[in-house]
From Swiss-Prot:
Primary subcellular site in the record, as a coarse category: secreted
Signal sequence residues: none
Residues that bear Serine amide: S9
Site (Aromatic residue important for selectivity towards vasopressin receptors): P3
Family, per entry: Belongs to the vasopressin/oxytocin family.
The organism's taxonomic lineage, starting at the top: Eukaryota, Metazoa, Spiralia, Lophotrochozoa, Mollusca
Protein name from the UniProt record: Conopressin-M1
Length: 9
């Protein structure tokens, strides 16, 4: 994922 774009799950 990208910085600040990663899913919480």
């Amino acid at each position: 994922c990208f910085p600040g774009n990663c899913p919480d799950s």
